[in-house]
Regions:
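Membrane-helix boundary elements
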Residues: 32-64
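Hydrophobic alpha-helical transmembrane segments of integral membrane proteins
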Residues: 93-118
Length: 154
């Protein structure tokens, strides 16, 4: 691995740790942030009432669960990349699991559209990212097969 790739991997690892720390901070501060958001941006047509605040807060915490899983999986994938273990079946599996986390986020944000219509856009973005990651996992699988064949022929 050349110096540029090592630097990029280290930056990605650092950003992943920042992401995970941000998720922890968000989990701690979520009730206050949500109350502030609703009080600041509540319009007449907003469907979040005090009765449904608990439902929205629960959905917000549900959004964090796949985020934590995806962050941990990304840290593991970056560890594999730094060791040069890219074209291997476990790497493709990790990418597929991250895609599943994206699909989970898609479903949760689709539920959010009842309260916040902008969540539909986020849901479609998560769906697109999940599909793209499945394609990348398939490419890694093909690359793994080619690498295995080359290892046997050399």
């Amino acid at each position: 691995m050349n110096a540029s790739m090592k630097r990029t991997t280290r930056i990605a690892q650092a950003l992943t740790l920042v992401l995970l720390a941000g998720l922890v901070a968000l989990a701690i501060c979520l009730p206050w942030l949500l109350r502030g958001y609703i009080s600041k941006f509540a319009y007449e047509n907003t469907t979040v009432s005090s009765a449904s605040f608990g439902i929205v807060l629960t959905l917000c915490y549900c959004v964090l669960i796949p985020g934590f899983f995806a962050g941990g999986l990304m840290a593991g994938l970056l560890r594999r990349v730094s060791r040069g273990l890219i074209f291997a079946a476990p790497s493709a599996l990790i990418i597929r699991l991250i895609a599943i986390c994206c699909f989970a986020e898609c479903a949760i944000f689709a539920l959010f559209t009842v309260y916040f219509t902008v969540s539909l856009g986020i849901s479609f973005c998560a769906l697109f990212l999940g599909i793209a990651l499945l394609v990348v996992a398939s490419v890694i699988d093909v690359g793994t097969e080619i690498k295995t064949e080359n290892d046997y022929t050399v």
